[in-house]
Amino acid sequence: MSYQGKKNIPRITSDRLLIKGGRIVNDDQSFYADIYMEDGLIKQIGDNLIVPGGVKTIEANGKMVIPGGIDVHTHFQMPYKGMTTVDDFFQGTKAALAGGTTMIIDHVVPEPESSLTEAYEKWREWADGKSCCDYALHVDITHWNDSVKQEVQNLIKDKGVNSFMVYMAYKDLYQVSNTELYEIFTCLGELGAIAQVHAENGDIIAQEQTRMLEMGITGPEGHVLSRPEELEAEAVFRAITIASQTNCPLYVTKVMSKSAADLISQARKKGNVVFGEPITASLGIDGTHYWSKNWAKAAAFVTSPPLSPDPTTPDYINSLLASGDLQLSGSAHCTFSTAQKAIGKDNFTAIPEGTNGVEERMSVIWDKAVATGKMDENQFVAVTSTNAAKIFNLYPRKGRISVGSDSDLVIWDPDAVKIVSAKNHQSAAEYNIFEGMELRGAPLVVICQGKIMLEDGNLHVTQGAGRFIPCSPFSDYVYKRIKARRKMADLHAVPRGMYDGPVFDLTTTPKGGTPAGSARGSPTRPNPPVRNLHQSGFSLSGTQVDEGVRSASKRIVAPPGGRSNITSLS
């Protein structure tokens, strides 16, 4: 049962659990074995296990047993312009568990010019009191100066944060400059953290938004029209370039378009340390809904970068996720009510951005990628759990079924079929962007911290039972290549003697003035004579005074063998 609203609920006490007859699926192998769990950890894996009494046995009946999902991108209980998203940490993590996700990583979004540490502590207080599953935190850098740099160092050293997001969009609010990007990436690379980017060209978006409003386009379609995918792609390319120059690992959040996905794929093939995170929405649906006649429906899809209006985009992004060109998945779950979205009913730039997806994420990927033959079950585990654990330095505690790992497990039924509906989803949002979609693949049993959270379609969650899981810096999965490159890229000056030859005398020219004679033209070529325009023989009609007179500066070149009768150069 749910304990929402009750105070001082004790944390979950772990049960002794035995899963029998399941097929264990990790990212690198699948095999049949039983699993014994105690005190929130996996204690034994194998056949004919000897276990103590008082064990609850779960018959898997040959079904897949996979590591619990890790959703790397959520926005629960996020403040926005005096409002708060409708899914707080209780409702949001409850929805996560219903979909097979046993850990989330939420974004701390400090107000511009405010303290990152204070915002972090606020998020910790909210999540500790309400989260039903384990969680970690990213911290967004919404401004940059020496004080923020010191806070970043402290958050990494003392607070268990190893990832920070910067915004290349939201001009005059969160957007940072290229110089600041360079400084932030340099700082994070030295500290062993992961640089995340929201990649869009904010300057051009601001211009396009103004243009759309001047044209009278005020509805949700204006959102996607003012943010074409080229602006996402340009920012991705720029971020990859700056990250490469600073030797900092780059993580692109919310990959929404073919162009952005292709750039990440190409950069990885060239050896760049870059990771791409598509979200439930970009994997499961397209942006044609922005043109819906129903304003509330169209507004429900507003998120940034926007969903692509190209209906072939989800299939394309799933293919890149299946092939490993994109590495992991999040939901970017950020839900507002229709009334909250309606503050932008007359101006699309004021519509609060965000879509649902934490509950649907794993089923969407199974249906769109595994059931269609693009992806095997092991890659499914990789992109929904294991790769996230490796990138954020949680592996093998999370993201793997092995002795000593946390007992966060899901018995997955590949044959289950469910129809998505806002009437029965766990989110508090009135609208579900996947409404009516039939999805193959669903969790039968969800175990978190060794406790059964979902069984027989019923949730058994406890508010505040989730633990904060600290993420340490210098993840091997991310930084082994970075460290090797630092050794190879050790720069040294070339030893040479002092130059003692002549030095050209460069006279400084006042700004806007005429350059001095010594600075005009090429130093290796004499300056040509200057014609006095007031004495020119040029006329608007008729022959010119100097017509037929060959200029001393004109070179006449004859072809080899002399002039031909075909071409006259005289």
Swiss-Prot record:
Tissues and organs where the protein is expressed, per its UniProt entry: Mainly expressed in heart and skeletal muscle. Also strongly expressed in fetal brain and spinal cord.
Residues that the record marks as modified (Phosphotyrosine) are 431, 499
User: Main role?
Assistant: Necessary for signaling by class 3 semaphorins and subsequent remodeling of the cytoskeleton. Plays a role in axon guidance, neuronal growth cone collapse and cell migration.
Which processes are annotated in GO (biological process)? actin crosslink formation; actin filament bundle assembly; cellular response to cytokine stimulus; negative regulation of cell migration; negative regulation of neuron projection development; neuron development; positive regulation of filopodium assembly; positive regulation of neuron projection development
Instruction: State whether keyword Cytoplasm applies.
Output: yes
Modification Phosphoserine occurs at: 259, 518, 522, 536, 539, 541
Q: Which family does it belong to?
A: Belongs to the metallo-dependent hydrolases superfamily. Hydantoinase/dihydropyrimidinase family.
Q: Where in the cell is it found?
A: Cytoplasm; Cell projection, Growth cone
Kindly list the GO CC terms recorded for this protein. cell body; cytosol; exocytic vesicle; extracellular space; filamentous actin; growth cone; lamellipodium; synapse
Renumbered residue ranges of the record's region Disordered: 506-570
Q: What is the protein's quaternary organization?
A: Homotetramer, and heterotetramer with CRMP1, DPYSL2, DPYSL4 or DPYSL5. Interacts with synaptic vesicle protein 2 and SH3A domain of intersectin. Interacts with FLNA.
Q: Where is the composition biased (Polar residues)?
A: 533-544
The opening ranks of the lineage are:
Eukaryota, Metazoa, Chordata, Craniata, Vertebrata
> What is the name attached to this protein's record?
Dihydropyrimidinase-related protein 3
